[in-house]
Amino acid sequence: ADKIFEETKKIINAFIQRITYVEFLPEILNAETLKNNELNEGIYGYEEFTDPRISNVFSTAAFQFIHSLTPSSIEFDGTETPLMDLFNNQNFLFLDTEKVAVYMMSSAGEPMDRFFSKQLTDHYFQSGNISFDLVAQIIQRGRDHGLPSYNTFRRHCGLPRLPHFYAMEAANVLKAVYHNIDDVDVFVGGMVEIPLPGSLLGPTFSCLIARQFRDTKFGDSHWYESADPKKGFNEGQLKSIKAMSAAKILCDGFGLSLIPENPFRVTSPSNPMVVCADLPGLDFQPWFLLGNQI
């Protein structure tokens, strides 16, 4: 029983790692950033002195970009529901999880830019006439955590320091809020950057996020591509794991019959619906041991 539990946990960890790096990261980072930071599949070697822990700037600022993609409402069973009505309301998740999953895969997020839904800035966890502003909270949290300025992180990433506001997008807006270019918070500066070609993010956030995912990968001795047979997988097992996809897991988990080929994107001519039954599943044959079965 312990062997089954541990091996199952190991397989699930491998799914999470692979789908995150092979399917999700290419949706936010461009090919050059992935290559330069060795985030592509097939490149791995454990680095004993690489710290895999989540950095302050990643969790507090850089990865908070995701909130810009949040829509103002969701449409469920033909009814459009404002996001504010769903905060702290998990009941709808248990009504029909399949419909929620299908909605999330079929509806595009908001554009990645410096603008956020008013549901997050004016009605976040609203109670009566009192609410929070998520963007203000992110900025304040960065200051509470002692994050250096946007320009400091540009230099940290090997990018040139910006000498004045007019080197930035939304210069007039920033100049009205900040006294000095070196006062600009890293979250604010990262959010107003022009995205790199083929990326959702500008150069600073691309750098900070890519470096974090590299550290998480190469600082993990149990990474799914490890050559250590006790920590990784044999050739047949690894081949079986690589055949699995987010689409197949969603199909099996929600009992779907059709799914977008890439569930991280909405359906389009380049991302058609595919039959779930046609997607390869996990082949357990490589886990059958001589005289023993897992």
Curated annotation (Swiss-Prot):
Disulfide bonds: none
Subcellular location as annotated: Secreted
Glycosites: 129
UniProt keyword Oxidoreductase, yes or no: no
Keyword Membrane: no
Gene Ontology cellular component terms for the protein in this record: extracellular region
Listed Gene3D superfamilies: Haem peroxidase domain superfamily, animal type
Domain of life: Eukaryota
Tissue: Component of the acid-insoluble and acid-soluble organic matrix of calcified layers of the shell (at protein level).
Molecular function GO terms recorded: heme binding; peroxidase activity
Main location as per UniProt: secreted
Key words, A-Z: Glycoprotein, Secreted
GO terms under biological process: response to oxidative stress
Matching SUPFAM superfamilies: Heme-dependent peroxidases (SSF48113)
Bilayer-spanning residue ranges: none
UniProt cross-references to PROSITE patterns, sorted A to Z: PEROXIDASE_3
Annotated family: Belongs to the peroxidase family.
Protein name listed in UniProt: Peroxidase-like protein 3
